[in-house]
């Protein structure tokens, strides 16, 4: 009886140990390697002002290759991020559309007022970004090709600012937990999104480690995310100001499949919907309105 009890206790201990085992989820950078991923982003926005709906839609498909260089003597590591394919279509009020296709990047906008938007896409496609990591794999700086910033107009310059790019790059991988986690454990992150024109949205997201899942014979670590707080702000120098806003997250779901062996994201899928009233100040006049914004994103590692 004692032997049976001992075996049962050992089995129970093993099961408990497996259930509570912690895993470390860390991004890895193997010098001299390449990886390619494709991303599909869709947005739908309805901004209601003075009783009129202003609706815009956009869809962007991109294929990006990351090339990891070799460690320098000081321990720094360069990673070049190059967009191989970029296709964007924007539906604007009044039935107007804006299209960009990297197979014909120099094609001009039908409406000259929209040319700055196309120029932003051209610059993104034609200029690889280099991320420099330090000896501890923290982002040290972001480098753009020489002369890129100087060539941009004021409306686009902030989107390519190396300091802002560094912050965005840190956020892009900052959702991973700082410490080893076990299934069911959660953590929170605060992030910002720069929409250009001095507009910034700030988010708070709760992430949860679900555990391992098997897909096509391969094991991945699954993480889910839920945005639970959002705020909207505009720089004081912007032509349009926000007097007040009460935006809420009405729909949020995010799923990440992480390849622990490679130390890389295999797949990311998220959807976020934001709704609520806001008051804009345009030419000194307060305009009450409401915002309904939906953002969907799918990213998958190809190789």
Role assignments for model-derived ranges:
Residues 5-16:
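Bacterial N-terminal signal peptides
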């Amino acid at each position: 009886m004692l032997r049976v009890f001992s075996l049962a206790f050992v089995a129970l201990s093993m099961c408990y140990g497996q259930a509570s085992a912690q895993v470390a989820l860390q991004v890895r950078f193997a010098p001299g390697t390449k990886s390619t991923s494709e991303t599909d982003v869709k947005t739908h926005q309805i901004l209601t002002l003075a009783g009129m709906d202003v609706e815009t839609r956009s869809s962007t498909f991109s294929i990006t290759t990351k090339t990891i260089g070799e460690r320098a003597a000081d321990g720094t590591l360069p990673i070049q991020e190059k967009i191989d394919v970029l296709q964007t279509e924007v539906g604007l009020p009044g039935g107007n559309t804006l299209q960009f296709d990297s197979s014909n990047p120099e094609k001009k906008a039908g409406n000259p007022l929209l040319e700055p938007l196309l120029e932003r896409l051209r610059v993104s496609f034609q200029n690889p970004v280099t991320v420099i990591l330090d000896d501890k794999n923290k982002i040290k700086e972001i480098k753009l090709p020489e002369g890129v910033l100087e060539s941009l107009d004021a409306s686009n310059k902030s989107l390519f600012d190396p300091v802002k790019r560094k912050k965005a790059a840190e956020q892009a991988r900052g959702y991973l937990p700082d410490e080893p986690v076990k299934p069911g454990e959660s953590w929170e992150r605060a992030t910002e999104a720069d929409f250009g024109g001095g507009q910034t949205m700030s988010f708070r997201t709760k992430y949860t480690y679900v555990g391992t899942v098997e897909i096509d014979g391969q094991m991945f670590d699954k993480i889910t995310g839920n945005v639970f707080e959002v705020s909207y702000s505009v720089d004081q120098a912007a032509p349009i100001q926000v007097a007040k806003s009460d935006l809420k997250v009405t729909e949020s779901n995010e799923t990440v499949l992480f390849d622990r062996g490679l130390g890389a994201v295999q797949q990311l899928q998220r959807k976020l919907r934001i709704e609520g009233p806001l008051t804009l100040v345009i030419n000194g006049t307060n305009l009450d309105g409401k915002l309904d914004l939906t953002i969907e994103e799918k990213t998958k590692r190809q190789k």
